């Protein structure tokens, strides 16, 4: 598989630097976070980095599937919601972390669950950008970001094949 014309391949080193840059931006706003909500699966890696840098210990996941194959976004499916304890007060004092906001559909779904939370993503595209409070890099809507966990020397199919949601 060859990369599309507007491809943005991200190495592990680059992603780590960008996630730390996100943590710096969040630290600069002086907010004390009572919890972090990580959007799986893409938000797991930046959440680990940001939670370390900001010393956030209470970490929750929200599991939403929208890409049911590699490159086609489908209907949103909430596989695991947010605990009532984290969701209280509309998510006040909660930091939501994801790798990317693309079309904004996933971000809108999580924003509806936690309307008072702060949404941070490492990368943002124009359609999703209005839903993000803090991000590091904006890329054009027609650029495909290749994250390091998706790549070998070429695109790598997951070991477990088939769609599980």
Swiss-Prot record:
Transmembrane segments: none annotated. GO terms for molecular function: guanine phosphoribosyltransferase activity; hypoxanthine phosphoribosyltransferase activity; magnesium ion binding; xanthine phosphoribosyltransferase activity. Its cofactor is Mg(2+). Keywords: Cell inner membrane, Cell membrane, Glycosyltransferase, Magnesium, Membrane, Metal-binding, Purine salvage, Transferase. GMP binds at residues 102-106, 144-145. GO terms for cellular component: plasma membrane. It is a peripheral membrane protein. Mg(2+) binds at residue 99. The keyword Transferase applies. 5-phospho-alpha-D-ribose 1-diphosphate binds at residues 41-42, 98-106. It is found in: Cell inner membrane. Gene3D superfamilies: 3.40.50.2020. Guanine binds at residues 102, 145. It is an enzyme of class 2 (transferase). It catalyses: GMP + diphosphate = guanine + 5-phospho-alpha-D-ribose 1-diphosphate; XMP + diphosphate = xanthine + 5-phospho-alpha-D-ribose 1-diphosphate; IMP + diphosphate = hypoxanthine + 5-phospho-alpha-D-ribose 1-diphosphate. It comes from the Bacteria. Purine salvage pathway enzyme that catalyzes the transfer of the ribosyl-5-phosphate group from 5-phospho-alpha-D-ribose 1-diphosphate (PRPP) to the N9 position of the 6-oxopurines guanine and xanthine to form the corresponding ribonucleotides GMP (guanosine 5'-monophosphate) and XMP (xanthosine 5'-monophosphate), with the release of PPi. To a lesser extent, also acts on hypoxanthine. Homotetramer. This is Xanthine-guanine phosphoribosyltransferase. The lineage of its organism: Bacteria, Pseudomonadati, Pseudomonadota, Alphaproteobacteria, Hyphomicrobiales.
């Amino acid at each position: 598989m060859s990369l599309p014309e507007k491809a943005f391949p991200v190495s592990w080193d680059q992603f780590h630097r960008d996630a730390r840059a996100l943590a710096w931006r969040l630290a600069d706003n002086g907010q004390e976070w009572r919890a972090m909500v990580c959007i799986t699966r893409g938000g797991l890696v930046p959440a680990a980095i940001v939670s370390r840098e900001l010393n956030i210990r209470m970490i929750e996941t929200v599991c939403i599937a929208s890409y049911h194959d590699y490159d086609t976004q489908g209907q949103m499916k909430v596989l695991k919601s947010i605990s009532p304890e984290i969701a209280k007060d509309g998510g006040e004092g909660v930091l939501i972390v994801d790798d990317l906001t693309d079309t904004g559909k996933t971000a809108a779904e999580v924003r509806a669950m936690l309307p008072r939370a702060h949404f941070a993503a490492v990368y943002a595209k124009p359609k999703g950008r209005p839903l993000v409070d803090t991000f590091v890099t904006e890329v054009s809507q027609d650029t495909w970001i290749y994250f390091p966990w998706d790549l070998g020397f070429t695109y790598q199919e997951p070991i477990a094949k088939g769609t599980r949601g």
